[in-house]
C-alpha cells in the first residue's frame, strides 16, 4: 500500500453519468493487480471528509485508471476534476482476483460485468489475455447508453456478449440467461464431453448483488468455479473502521469479515448471499 498525494490527472473521458480518469502514479501502477482498488480523496477541501473506493480499471507502467458513475456528491465532485489537477490517492488496496501460476493451455474465462461493474473486469481481461487465457466478456446494462466501454472492448478484439434490460442493444434481458446459454454451449461440445483433461471454464464477475447472486447460482449448477468482486461503501479502506463488512462462510462457519481487508474478491463458495 502506497500513498500518492499528487497523482496528476492526465486524461479524462465522460459518457453521460459515467467518467474515466487516468492518473499518473508510477509507484502505485507498478504494484496494481486486477481486482484491487484505490481510496481517493475526491476534493481539495475538507468536504467530503472520507475518501471514496474505486476499482482499478487499468494500468500501464506509469498510470492507473478508474471508471465510475456519478452517483452522489462525492463522485460528482470527482467527475468535475480536470486534467492537470492532482488527486490524493492510496493504493493498491485489497486482495484481487486469484489467477494462479499454472499454464494457460486449455483455459477459458467467462468475465461478467454489470453496469459500472465492468471497471475491474477490463483490467482482468487484459491480464488474462496476456497469459494466453481464452477470454469471453459478458457486458450488461440497463440500456445501450449504459455500455460506454463497449467500443473500446470491440476495438481491442475481445470476444464480447452484450445484453440490455430494454433490448436496445444485444440480448434483450439480464446478463445471466445469456451467460448460462453460452456456458451450456461450451460445456456440451463433443470435445468437452469426451475429454477429461480439458479444463472447465472459470467465471469472474462484478456488478449489482442480484446479478452476482444469479451468476453464483449458474456456477453452482454447472459446477464451475467463480470469483466475485464485491462493491461496498468504505470509510477507510484499510480495515480500521469496520464499515464494509460482509458475511462470509469458510470451513463450514459463517462470520463477518471486512471487504477492504479480506476482499474485495471472494470465491463463490465463500459468499453468503442475502435473499433478493
Descriptions of predicted regions:
Residues 11, 58, 162-164, 228, ...:
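Structural signal for conserved beta-strand scaffold positions within catalytic alpha/beta enzyme cores
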Residues 2-85:
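Ferredoxin-reductase
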Amino acid at each position: 500500500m502506497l500513498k500518492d498525494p499528487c497523482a496528476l490527472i492526465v486524461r479524462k473521458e465522460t459518457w453521460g453519468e459515467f467518467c474515466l480518469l487516468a492518473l499518473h502514479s508510477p509507484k502505485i501502477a507498478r504494484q496494481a493487480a486486477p481486482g484491487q482498488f484505490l481510496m481517493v480523496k475526491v476534493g481539495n477541501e475538507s468536504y467530503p471528509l472520507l475518501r471514496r473506493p474505486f476499482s482499478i480499471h487499468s494500468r500501464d507502467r506509469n498510470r492507473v485508471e478508474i471508471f465510475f458513475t456519478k452517483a452522489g456528491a462525492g463522485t460528482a465532485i470527482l467527475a468535475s476534476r480536470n486534467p492537470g489537477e492532482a488527486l490524493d490517492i492510496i493504493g493498491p488496496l485489497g486482495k484481487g482476483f486469484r489467477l494462479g501460476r499454472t499454464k494457460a493451455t486449455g483455459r477459458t474465462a467467462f468475465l461478467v460485468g454489470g453496469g459500472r461493474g465492468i471497471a475491474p473486469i477490463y483490467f482482468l481481461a487484459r491480464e488474462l489475455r496476456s497469459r494466453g487465457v481464452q477470454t469471453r466478456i459478458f457486458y450488461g446494462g440497463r440500456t445501450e447508453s449504459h455500455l460506454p466501454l463497449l467500443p473500446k472492448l470491440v476495438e481491442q478484439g475481445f470476444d464480447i456478449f452484450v445484453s440490455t434490460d430494454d433490448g436496445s442493444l444485444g440480448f434483450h434481458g439480464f446478463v445471466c440467461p445469456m451467460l448460462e446459454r453460452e456456458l451450456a454451449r461450451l460445456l456440451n461440445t463433443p470435445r468437452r464431453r469426451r475429454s477429461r483433461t480439458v479444463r472447465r471454464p472459470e467465471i469472474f464477475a462484478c456488478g449489482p448483488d442480484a446479478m452476482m447472486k444469479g451468476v453464483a447460482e449458474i456456477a453452482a449448477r454447472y459446477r464451475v468455479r467463480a470469483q466475485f468482486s464485491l462493491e461496498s461503501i468504505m470509510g477507510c479502506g484499510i480495515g480500521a473502521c469496520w464499515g464494509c463488512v460482509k458475511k462470509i462462510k469458510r470451513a463450514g462457519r459463517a462470520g463477518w469479515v471486512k471487504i477492504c481487508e479480506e476482499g474485495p474478491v471472494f470465491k463463490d463458495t465463500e459468499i453468503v448471499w442475502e435473499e433478493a
